[in-house]
Amino acid sequence: DWENVIPLAEELLKDFPLLQGDDYVKMIQDKATTQSNVFIRSYVFQGADNSETQVSSAIPYRPVNKSFIDLFTEKEADIRYALSFNKKREETKVLRGRVRCAEMVLMLAESYAQLSDTENALKYLNLLRSHRITPYIPYTLENLPEVNPDALIRVDATGKPLTRLMAAIMNERQKELFMEGDRWFELKRNGRPEFWVAKDGQKYVCQKFMYTAPIHRNDLELVPGMQQNPGYE
């Protein structure tokens, strides 16, 4: 419903403009309070969840994927580069689920792109980049990066192959919302790509059907005619 996204996101953006520089870093790395343009955040009460402790203990053994690092073509000129990981490829960004104004900018860029309004799509894509990259070169239809054929996401939310513009929007979303609980949902709504990870010498494959959870056996037994989700029969 791309048309309805636009007025709502634009209204929120007027009230909660983008941060940049030190203000942005402070907002991202704050563990205790809800900063300025954050609408909703996880871990409102300190100590309410041990997920951060679990993640911290796993960081040395799970380096940041090189394909993600390669998205930062401007390197240190992008403030998110040093904020997200260190030279050992260890994650350094504070783990927090958030809904904040930067996501509204990304939603606007994507919505306008889906409506074939490339001028406004570029406007909002460049708005975000101008607040994160110094010095910054605006994207145009002519200088957009080529679509990476090896990227995990290869189709958009409508199932169409990614254009250069949509791929650039997806890349900015991945960089901006890293460690904020967004990536799984992006994979789910953009083609449900299959991938694998290794742990303890074993290969674990995420198949398309796994983006939907199975229905509990008790519910299947209690509700006559209820069908198990595909892949879990």
Region annotations inferred by a language model:
Residues 1-49, 66-233:
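Acidic/polar-rich alpha-helix caps and helix-coil junctions
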Residues 50-64:
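Active-site-adjacent substrate-recognition loops and nearby beta-strands
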